Structures are given as structure tokens and as C-alpha cells.
């Protein structure tokens, strides 16, 4: 078998399967597997535990100005990920599919950095440190993990056990049926990245980015058809949207909703004026947060 075809099969047997699994669990929360219906569902159910937030702020006031900058970076990366907007632009958007994976990762990473900066003023010197802190101190905390992060983003692998136990939280039978595949994904991630502690999906997203950067990302242009491109596009957009909505809910809790909306208005003004880009997907999320009046500090 030629090396390029080995890479072709390798992708289909790993990242294609894992993204399908993650996306299936996410979309199982609603009857209509669309971003809009997921946003409505999550904004009604996700929240940041106020006691957890007070405890963290008592220990460390964080760096709010830096958190705001990271949040705007996350939005900028998400705009790049979604450009050009619309299902009719799928082929154009995914022409350089591996670069979209990189933009997806930096959307997630900037979102992680945002939340860490709300509760941690110490210097974070590497991506490894940030990902490990996020998983061990935020996602693994029983008080918030499935309150703020929807399945499967709430799951971590500790040893060989998936936490929280899928049977202990409110998810569909379809979602539970994909949890064994999720365990396989996280075990493979832990082995690939040589992780010593708990593994979360944010670690997997780093592995996915490394595949795009260092393996054979160029094979998308040569070998994969519309179905594979569509699956990748759907996965990246749905996952980043759900993750960032959780980060925005946490930002509304730490900053206050009006402060968050003001930051977004300034960001939007710059994006439209300088980039001629209308971030309609962000408008939708901000409108929902404002409409539902997400509880704040």
C-alpha cells in the first residue's frame, strides 16, 4: 500500500469516525440537528454554578482584560472557520480543509484561555498547560461539568472510565450508544499525546490539529469527496458553536451580560467595517443570551 493511501485509511478510521461520534452525541440533544435548535436548547439548560464561580474568584480574581481579549480572538477564529458563510459555499469553505481544522482548534483554544483567565492570573506558558488545567480544574469539577458543557464536551477519561457516567446524566439512548466510540477516541488521544492525567475532548482537538499540521492534511484536496468534506464541515461548525456558547455563558456570568454584549458590539463593528464580514452566527447567539437574560454575577 502506498503511503498516501495509508494516510487516507488512517483518517477514515480515526478522525472521520471520532468527529462523527462527537457530532452525533451533540445533535442528539434536539430533534432537529441544526445549530439554531441546539443554541435554543443549550441556552435554556446550560449555566455556570454561582457557588463554584464565587469560590474561584475568592481564590484568584483572574485577569478580566486578558480574558476579554481571548474571547475576541476566539470570535475572530470562528469567523475565519466559517468563512464564507452558508451551506452553498461548502466547497469553497473546505477547499483548504486542513486549514479549517487549525482555525477550529484556535477557536477552541482561545475559548479555553478566556475561561481560564477569569479564574487564574498565573502565566500559562504552553498549550499543554492550558488544556490540562481546563480539563482537570474546570471540566472535571462535578459542580459545573454537565451544567455548563453539553455532552459530549462534559466527558473526561480517567483511567479507563468515562466521567460523568453516561447513565447518570440526561442524554438520549442514541447518545449513550456512541459513548464506547468516545472512549476509544479519548484512549487514542491519551496514547497519541502521551498524557499522564485525565483526557478530555479539548485534548483530542489538539491531536486533530496536529494531524492537519504534520501528517498528510493535503490529501483532502486529492482523495476525499463531498461526503467526507461535509462531515468535517458539519463537525467543526457544530462543535465550535456549542463550545463557544458555553464559554459565552461563562463570560456573561463573570462579566455581566451587558458588559459581554458591549464587547461583542465593538467586535462586530470592527468585523463589518474592516473585514466586510457579517457574523450572523454570533448575532444569533448574542440575541439568545440577551433574550433569555442569562444569570450573571
Task: Label the predicted regions.
Residues 1-297:
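Terminal alpha-helical segments
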Amino acid at each position: 500500500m502506498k503511503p498516501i493511501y495509508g494516510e487516507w485509511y488512517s483518517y477514515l478510521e480515526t478522525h472521520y469516525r471520532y468527529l462523527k461520534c462527537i457530532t452525533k452525541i451533540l445533535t442528539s440533544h434536539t430533534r432537529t440537528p441544526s445549530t439554531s435548535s441546539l443554541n435554543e436548547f443549550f441556552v435554556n439548560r446550560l449555566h455556570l454554578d454561582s457557588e463554584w464561580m464565587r469560590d474561584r474568584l475568592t481564590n484568584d480574581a483572574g485577569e478580566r482584560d486578558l480574558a476579554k481579549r481571548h474571547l475576541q480572538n476566539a470570535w475572530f477564529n470562528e469567523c475565519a472557520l466559517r468563512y464564507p458563510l452558508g451551506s452553498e459555499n461548502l466547497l469553497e469553505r473546505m477547499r483548504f480543509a486542513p486549514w479549517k481544522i487549525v482555525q477550529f482548534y484556535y477557536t477552541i483554544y482561545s475559548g479555553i484561555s478566556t475561561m481560564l483567565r477569569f479564574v487564574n492570573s498565573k502565566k500559562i506558558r504552553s498549550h499543554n498547560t492550558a488544556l490540562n488545567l481546563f480539563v482537570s480544574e474546570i471540566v472535571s469539577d462535578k459542580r459545573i461539568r454537565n451544567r455548563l458543557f453539553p455532552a459530549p464536551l462534559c466527558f473526561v477519561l480517567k483511567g479507563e472510565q468515562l466521567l460523568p457516567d453516561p447513565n447518570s446524566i440526561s442524554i438520549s439512548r442514541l447518545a449513550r450508544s456512541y459513548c464506547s466510540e468516545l472512549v476509544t477516541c479519548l484512549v487514542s488521544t491519551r496514547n497519541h499525546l502521551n498524557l499522564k492525567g485525565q483526557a478530555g475532548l479539548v485534548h483530542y482537538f489538539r491531536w486533530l490539529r496536529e494531524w492537519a499540521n504534520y501528517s498528510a492534511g493535503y490529501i483532502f484536496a486529492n482523495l476525499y469527496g463531498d461526503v467526507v468534506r461535509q462531515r468535517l464541515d458539519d463537525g467543526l461548525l457544530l462543535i465550535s458553536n456549542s463550545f463557544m456558547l458555553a464559554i459565552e455563558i461563562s463570560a456573561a456570568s463573570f462579566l455581566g451580560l451587558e458588559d459581554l454584549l458591549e464587547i461583542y458590539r465593538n467586535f462586530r463593528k470592527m468585523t463589518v467595517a474592516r473585514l466586510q464580514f457579517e457574523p450572523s452566527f454570533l448575532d444569533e447567539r448574542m440575541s439568545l443570551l440577551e433574550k433569555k437574560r442569562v444569570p450573571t454575577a
